[in-house]
A protein has these predicted regions:
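Anionic-ligand binding patches
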Residues: 1-136
Length: 136
């Protein structure tokens, strides 16, 4: 992005889901998505979201590299609920095969951490970085 004063900033963010040491990226197909949700239901898992910001200001570069962990507790789900969710929503582009901001929210018992990081971008922290650098 070009900042009004002519400086530049690049923002990147990505997310993975981890349960019992197994990494759940984006599912490769419908069956993989069902497998992931069956593993995640009825238990706690971690969502890791990275945030990388590079700011060029007057020829100098500032870098911010951070990782956020949020614990998500998913209610027990029936197989029919999992299949319905997978068949109704585009889950193939979501780490762990779910989007917390979709209908899947009804299956969330609670979370400990940053909701926006689970969605994919820790926006509050990004705002702080921009504010600190007088971009916002």
């Amino acid at each position: 992005m070009i900042i009004p004063n002519g400086d530049r900033a690049v923002v990147g963010s990505d997310t993975i889901v981890v349960k019992d040491g197994e990494v759940f990226g984006k599912p490769k197909d419908r069956e993989d998505a069902i497998r992931m949700l069956k593993a995640l239901q009825g238990a706690r898992h971690s969502v890791y979201t990275s945030l990388s910001v590079i700011i060029e200001e007057k020829g100098k570069v500032k870098e911010y590299k951070e990782v956020y962990e949020t614990y998500v507790y998913v209610k027990p789900m029936e197989d029919s609920e999992i299949i319905n969710y997978v068949d109704t929503y585009n889950v193939l582009d979501k780490a762990g095969a779910y989007a917390i901001q979709s209908k899947f929210a009804v299956y969330i018992e609670r979370l400990d951490g940053d909701y926006n990081a689970i969605v994919g971008l820790p926006i509050s922290r990004l705002y702080d970085i921009f504010k600190e650098n007088e971009i916002w």
